[in-house]
From Swiss-Prot:
Protein family: Belongs to the GcvP family. N-terminal subunit subfamily.
Protein name: Probable glycine dehydrogenase (decarboxylating) subunit 1
EC number(s) stated in the UniProt entry for this protein: 1.4.4.2
EC class (word): oxidoreductase
InterPro entries with a match to the protein in the record: GcvPA, GDC-P_N, GDC_P, PyrdxlP-dep_Trfase, PyrdxlP-dep_Trfase_major, PyrdxlP-dep_Trfase_small
Reaction catalyzed: N(6)-[(R)-lipoyl]-L-lysyl-[glycine-cleavage complex H protein] + glycine + H(+) = N(6)-[(R)-S(8)-aminomethyldihydrolipoyl]-L-lysyl-[glycine-cleavage complex H protein] + CO2
Record organism: Chlorobium limicola (strain DSM 245 / NBRC 103803 / 6330)
Coiled-coil region: none
Assembly: The glycine cleavage system is composed of four proteins: P, T, L and H. In this organism, the P 'protein' is a heterodimer of two subunits.
Biological process, per Gene Ontology: glycine decarboxylation via glycine cleavage system; nucleoside metabolic process
GO molecular function per UniProt: glycine dehydrogenase (decarboxylating) activity
Pfam families to which the protein is assigned, alphabetical: GDC-P
Length: 443
């Protein structure tokens, strides 16, 4: 629909209706010396076709996984997303919905969120899940703040190798809150040292945090880490990859008090870094301390099932100064995508995705380490990604592979380390894996 400007008569009628004689009356309070007295220096008007051509030209400078074979990981993964996911979430009643404060007119949205919460509880083996957080990093940061509130303590121990980006967000949250100190456990073979962790524990530790699998893709000794936390009265927080839970033990099964995760692999595209989905689950005793929105199921006066936002006194729109967090509009659409994705795959489907990731990652690691100069940096078990020691700097390899249409991985020098972090999802075919190996061999 074209934009039709107001006529002089339209403007006169509007001014007259508010008691003004001219537009200058509306800006009389702005000192003349700071007013712009010339026309704005804007681009000349373009047609729709010209705008599309301009934007396509600008976007062509980007390289995306849509046109490359991607082995990039480190927190965002190139998984296959069934076309039905987009078809369902694009329905207008989902796509344009806002926060469902009025339950009587939002039953569809509320039920969808309730189903998402139920799926997260089953996947993570926890009692309660909220409606979502902004992303996995903010979910973990909120979990740490929650642990400090519950325990009254101020220290947090990072038991293993946490994503440096998540760690940066956590540091920002703690600095903004005015309290909290982070202690990093020492690493051995790319995972946290259990003995080192025990040496860091004391009665001031509010929470022990572990990422499973960790940033290197390696599997941490989560049961021993959880036991060390419980022995000292600290809460045990696990940031678990949701896809890995298709084959790995769920956080609830080994005693997590709070389990969070990055939900991007569940039906959400990489989206150049966002929007993403923060998964947040807790045990029942902590339900009134959980941040974010909660959808509950109830009965109406006629005995029919209904869905509502429950325990709202925790939230900032009720009692801002006493809210458990100030998250407002959450990632409900991303959460819906995760719920639709899991519904389409089912229990067996998510298990198959996890198995394919593991098998293909181990196949690729085996093939690459047959090449001269390439070796695994760590020998700990891994799930979907692994760190390579390479004969050439990782940046050189990544640049060379780009010319062959391959994202070779993540250069760990970006976080002050050495090595190439390579991720493999179920999307990668045997031919793509072998082609990557051949391309590396040709360097």
């Amino acid at each position: 629909m074209p934009f039709i400007v107001n006529t002089d008569q339209d403007r006169e009628e509007m001014l007259r209706s508010i008691g003004a004689s001219s537009f200058d009356d509306l800006i009389a309070d702005i000192p003349p010396e700071i007013r712009l007295d010339r026309a704005l220096e804007l681009f000349p008007a373009l047609s729709e076709q010209e705008v599309m051509t301009l934007l396509e030209g600008l976007s062509s400078a980007n390289s995306s996984s849509a046109g490359f074979v991607s082995f990039l990981g480190g927190g965002a993964y190139d998984h296959f997303i069934p076309s039905a996911v987009k078809s369902i979430v694009s329905r207008s009643e989902f796509y344009t919905a806002y926060t469902p404060y009025q339950a009587e007119v939002s039953q569809g949205t509320l039920q969808a969120i309730y189903e998402y919460q139920s799926m997260m509880c089953r996947l993570y083996d926890m009692d309660v899940a909220n409606a979502s957080m902004y992303d996995g990093a903010t979910a973990l940061a909120e979990a740490v703040l929650m642990a400090m509130t519950i325990t009254g303590r101020e220290l947090v121990v990072l038991a293993g190798k946490l994503s440096p980006y998540t760690g940066s967000v956590l540091k920002t949250y703690l600095e903004a809150s005015g309290h909290g100190v982070i202690h990093q456990n020492r690493l051995e073979n790319g995972i946290g040292s259990v003995d080192g962790l025990k040496g860091l524990m004391n009665d001031r530790v509010a929470a022990v945090v572990v990422q499973q699998p960790n940033f290197y893709g390696s599997l941490e000794e989560v049961e021993a880490i959880g036991a060390a936390a419980r022995e000292n009265g600290a809460l045990f927080i696990v940031s678990a990859d949701p896809v890995s839970l298709g084959i790995l033990a769920a956080p609830g099964s080994y005693g997590a008090d709070i389990a969070v995760g990055e939900g991007q692999p569940l039906g959400n595209h990489q989206n150049f870094g966002g929007p993403y989905l923060g998964i947040f689950t807790v045990r029942q005793p902590y339900v009134r301390k959980i941040p974010g929105r909660l959808v509950g199921m109830t009965k109406d006066r006629e005995g029919n099932d209904g869905f509502i936002l429950t325990l709202q006194t925790r939230e900032q729109h009720i009692r801002r100064e006493k809210a458990t967090s100030n998250i407002c509009t959450n990632q409900a659409l991303c959460a819906l995508q995760a719920a639709v994705y899991l519904s389409l795959l089912g229990k067996q489907g998510i298990r198959e995705v996890a198995e394919q990731c593991t098998l293909k990652a181990h196949y690729l690691a085996g093939r690459i380490t047959e090449l001269p100069g390439y070796s695994l940096k760590y020998s700990a078990p891994f799930f979907r990604e692994f760190v390579l020691e390479t004969p050439l700097p990782a940046a050189v390899i990544i640049s060379a592979m780009l010319e062959k249409g391959i994202f070779a991985g993540y250069d760990l020098s970006a976080s002050g380390e050495n090595g190439l972090l390579v991720a493999v999802t179920e999307k990668r075919t045997r031919a793509e894996l072998d082609s990557f190996v051949q391309a590396l061999a040709a360097l």
